[in-house]
Regions:
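Hydrophobic, proline/glycine-rich low-complexity stretches
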Residues: 2-5, 9, 13-40, 44-61, ...
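Long, compositionally biased interface segments
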Residues: 26-29, 231-287
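Forkhead-associated
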Residues: 49-99
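Short strand-coil-strand connectors
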Residues: 58-60, 87, 110-112, 191-195, ...
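Broad, structure-driven detector of short, well-ordered beta-strand segments within folded domains
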Residues: 62-67, 72-77, 113-120, 197-201
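Phosphate/adenylate-binding glycine loop and adjacent helical scaffold
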Residues: 89-117, 124
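Surface-exposed beta-loop interaction hotspot
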Residues: 112, 118-182
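Acidic/His-leaning functional-site neighborhoods
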Residues: 186-234, 243
Length: 287
């Protein structure tokens, strides 16, 4: 049988030109945001406090309530007619939905298109995130607008580790000015066009997340700012390829609460590289 994807012998070689590599990356980004649990599929994030009464959650059946303090997850009550499945089992009565902070987080499926999972805050609160693979945002999505590739904004910087890291408060979009501490493991420094920069990025998985804004923010790019994943090299250097700057999840759904750029990460100059805005099919801004 012929492999519909083509054999290794006939597969097209991977692109090596930076602009072509970027085009492949951007195509994959547009595919990822429309996945069943991609950014555009998120229709609700509902926090349920420790002392809350059982309550409905928009977009999914059942009534939801907290577990005992210190126990990961939420409790749901539903009838078999609701069609709600937790870890593959139809709920007819009560079920415990383990949070993503548990070694074995629960899966929740309400229909062919609606799913959910429980997230935890750093303070130990829990919320249900509801995803709809046929959300209005997915139906209206027209693409991610972006700048052309810019060699100017591939910057070589120095990374100076901070022993033990430094706790730094980051404001978040929905927190009314309150900050959440993130550990910044080192300083990112470079000089460009005669200006010295010192940036702060916090750990996100195996890499560092740089949250920044610039003179394009709120003009030709998303107003809250943009993200850039970076990774220091063993020799103490770090490459900031702003062509890979991407829109934060909150640019796709109001149900995300994104960190905002600290003062030192707010560039006074325009960075005309990377993603710009989420577009609707008619070319207007989706949000």
């Amino acid at each position: 049988m012929t492999d519909p994807a083509g054999s290794a012998a006939t597969a097209a070689p991977a692109p090596t030109d930076p602009a072509e590599v970027l085009a492949v990356y951007r195509s994959r980004r547009e595919q990822m945001v429309v996945l069943p649990q991609g950014n555009l599929a998120l229709v609700n994030t509902q926090w349920i406090s420790h002392d809350a009464d059982p309550q409905p959650v928009y977009g999914i059946p059942g009534t939801w309530s907290p577990l005992e303090p210190g126990v990961s997850g939420l409790r749901v009550r539903a009838s078999a007619d609701d069609g709600l499945r937790v870890d593959g089992v139809l709920v007819d009565g009560e079920a415990v939905v383990r949070g993503r902070d548990d070694p074995r987080p629960s899966s929740v499926v309400a229909s062919d298109t609606v799913s959910a999972f429980v997230i935890a805050s750093e303070e130990g609160a829990y919320a249900l995130r509801v995803w709809d693979a046929q959300s209005e945002a997915i139906r209206d999505f027209g693409g991610i607008d972006a700048f052309p590739y810019s060699e100017e904004w591939v910057v070589e910087a120095d990374f100076t580790p901070i022993e033990g890291g430094r706790a730094m408060g980051f404001e978040h979009l929905k927190d009314d000015g309150a900050t959440k501490d993130k550990i910044v493991p080192g300083e990112i420094t470079f000089t460009k066009d005669g200006v010295d920069y010192s940036l702060a990025a916090f750990r996100e998985g195996r890499a560092l997340l740089l949250v920044f804004s610039d003179a394009t923010s709120g003009e030709s790019t998303y107003g809250v700012g943009r993200f850039l994943m970076v990774a220091p090299s063993p020799d103490g250097t770090i490459t900031l390829d702003f062509n890979r700057a991407y829109l934060p999840p909150c640019a796709f759904s109001y149900n995300f609460n994104c960190p905002m750029p600290p003062k030192q990460n707010r560039f006074a100059v325009p960075i005309e590289a990377g993603e710009k805005n989420v577009l609707a099919k008619d070319g207007t801004l989706l949000h």
